[in-house]
Amino acid sequence: MYPYSDADAFRRHPERAKSSQLRTSAVDTRSAFARDRARVLHSAALRRLADKTQVVGPNDGDTPRTRLTHSLEVAQIARGIGAGLDLDPDLCDLAGLCHDIGHPPYGHNGENALNEVAAACGGFEGNAQTLRILTRLEPKIVSDEGASFGLNLSRAALDAACKYPWAKTNADGSVNKKYSAYDEDAEILDWIRQGHEDLRPPIEAQVMDFSDDIAYSVHDVEDGIVSGRIDLKVLWDLVELAALADKGAAAFGGSPAELIEGAASLRELPVVAAAADFDFSLRSYAALKAMTSELVGRYVGSTIESTKKTHAGIDVGRMYGDLIIPETAASEVKLLKTLAVLYVMDDPGHLARQNRQRDRIFRVFDYLVLGAPGSLDPMYRQWFIEANSESEQIRVIVDQIASMTESRLERLARNAADISGFLG
C-alpha cells in the first residue's frame, strides 16, 4: 500500500485517543482513514441523501436510485479501484460516500436555484458545500471555544473529497465556475492542500470522480431502462445516435465522433445486445444486471491496468500519479452518461417539474429570510445570530435549505404558501 504520512492523517483539531470498548483501557486500533470513513457513514448529512434526487426523484418508481444509493455504489467502485492500485481502500471509499454530500434538494436543478438566491453571499456550489459540511456544518467535533470543526476528518480524507481543489475566486480576481471551497473557506482548503505543487486533485479524488462517472452512467442507464425512458436499441439506430452524440458532446465536451465510437464498441458486447431486448421479464432483468456488472468490471479493470502500466515501479498515492482511463472506457462511459441524462431531460414533464422545484426553493428561502432567526432550526439560528454581516446571514439560510431533504422542503414550501395566502 502507498506509504501515507503522519501529515496525511493529521486533523485540524487535535483529538484524544479513543477507547475501543467499555470499561477497558484498550485503544481504538483503526487507521485514521477507517475512522474517517465511519464518521461519514454515520453522519446525518449522508442519511439525508436518501431523500434527494439522483436522475429521477426518490419517489418515482418502486426501486429508484437516490443520492444515497448512488453514493454507496460510487464508494464500492472507488474502493475496488483503490485496492487495485494499492491505495488506502477506506480513503477511496469515504471519498465516494461524501462526493455528493453537499448536493441540495432536487440535484443540479436545486443547485442552480440556490445559486440564484445565494448571490448576495457569493453563490452556491455543491462541491464547495460538501467541504463546508465536512469541516463546519455536520456536528461532531467542537472546540472548547465553541468553534465547529465538522467531522474533523484527516487532511488526506478531505483532500480526497475535493474534486475541484481550488476556491471560487482566483488570486487575479477571476472566478471559477466549479470549485471545492467558497472564498470564506479558502483557508481550510489551503490547509488541506499543503504539500501539493500544482492544482491537480490527489489520485484518490480522481478515483472518486471516475467512479462517480461509472456509477452515474451504468446504473442510471439501468434505472432509465426499467422506467421506460431509455431504449438501448438507439445504439443501432445510426440517425438517432448521431443526434444523441451531438447533444452529448455539447453537454459533456469531446466530439460527437468520440461518442459514436463508444456506441460502436458497446454494440460489440453480447451483454449489451441482450439487455437491449428488455421486456420486464425475469430473464430480461437478469440480462440487465449482467450488463451492469460486466460494464462496471470492464471500466474498473481496464483503468487499474492502464494506471499500473503507466506508473510501473512507482508508488502512486496522494499527489503522486494520475488515474489513466483508457480511451475506449472513457468514450463508452460518456455515451452512457449522455443516455442517462438527455433521455430524462427530454421527458415532456421534466421542464414543468423543474419549475415547480425551483418555485419551492424560492418560496422557502423567502419564508426563512422573513422569519429569521425564529424560522431557522436551533443550530442555524445560533449561527445566524452570531453572523457579522447580512452576507453571512444569507449563507446560514442557504446552508439550512441545502441540508433539507426533499420531503421536508416540500412540507415547508406548503406551509409557507398557506401562511402567505392567509396574510393576503
Swiss-Prot record:
Q: Which PROSITE patterns match?
A: HD (PS51831)
Q: Which cysteines are joined by disulfide bonds?
A: none
Superkingdom to which the source organism belongs: Bacteria
- Coiled-coil regions, chain positions: none
* Pfam family membership, one: HD_assoc
Which residues lie within the region annotated Disordered?
1-24
SMART domains registered for this protein in UniProt: HDc
Compositionally biased residues, Basic and acidic residues: 8-18
Which GO MF term does the entry hold, naming one?
dGTPase activity
InterPro entries in alphabetical order: dGTPase, dGTPase-like, dNTPase_2, HD/PDEase_dom, HD_domain, PHydrolase_assoc_dom
Keyword annotations? Hydrolase
Gene Ontology terms: biological process = dGTP catabolic process
Ranges for domain HD come to: 67-217
**Similarity remark:** Belongs to the dGTPase family. Type 2 subfamily.
Q: Which NCBIfam families match?
A: dGTP_triPase, PRK03007.1
> What name does this protein carry?
Deoxyguanosinetriphosphate triphosphohydrolase-like protein
